[in-house]
UniProtKB/Swiss-Prot annotation:
EC nos: 4.1.2.4
Pathway assignment: Carbohydrate degradation; 2-deoxy-D-ribose 1-phosphate degradation; D-glyceraldehyde 3-phosphate and acetaldehyde from 2-deoxy-alpha-D-ribose 1-phosphate: step 2/2
Sequence similarity: Belongs to the DeoC/FbaB aldolase family. DeoC type 2 subfamily.
Gene Ontology biological process: 2-deoxyribose 1-phosphate catabolic process; carbohydrate catabolic process; deoxyribonucleotide catabolic process
UniProt name for this protein: Deoxyribose-phosphate aldolase
Main location: cytoplasm
Amino acid sequence: MTDLKASSLRALKLMDLTTLNDDDTDEKVIALCHQAKTPVGNTAAICIYPRFIPIARKTLKEQGTPEIRIATVTNFPHGNDDIEIALAETRAAIAYGADEVDVVFPYRALMAGNEQVGFDLVKACKEACAAANVLLKVIIETGELKDEALIRKASEISIKAGADFIKTSTGKVAVNATPESARIMMEVIRDMGVEKTVGFKPAGGVRTAEDAQKYLSIADELFGADWADARHYRFGASSLLASLLKALGHGDGKSASSY
């Protein structure tokens, strides 16, 4: 197996196969569930809006893949600093049956100098998730923070407040995941000594098998080749799947989605 094939198989099994579009429908989510079951293995999860969780759960069970996890998003994509709303949305997502919640950090508040509200928001959402055995991923929106010091600070605050994963981006802004921001965030995980309990998720803009290989190589460099498993590493993507399958000898590499 070539290096690209090997990394593509790894990446496929680490994907949070995503649809977060305004025109999502039950039919599109059902199709996403079908795509998550591939000839070479399943994606780790799907990521959808909360209202589609029940139909996704039913579809995954019916197709014989109940182990594919269901992730959803809250405080999304705006990252406002209203803790009560973020918490209410997170509780609602849990009630819908989410296995994982990706909450947007109040990044604009941090840019304006307020570190406390981010900590408090993540902590509140973490307490709700922990009580239900739900994983919490925190989206810090690196492409808007831009500054390395702010990316580090948002990562540190999220981890201290209980994040199970730190995630680069919503996929809804001009600049999403980049290898540079990925390295900064994973270095924070390393420097804080939390690599056993905290994972990393690049999202938005990871579109090709070569992109995925590049991101995995950073993780391997920092933590060794065994770290990037489904508990410690995810790719938030949709169009990536077709490219990975093509690299693995399945399909033509074309995708209908741009995430």
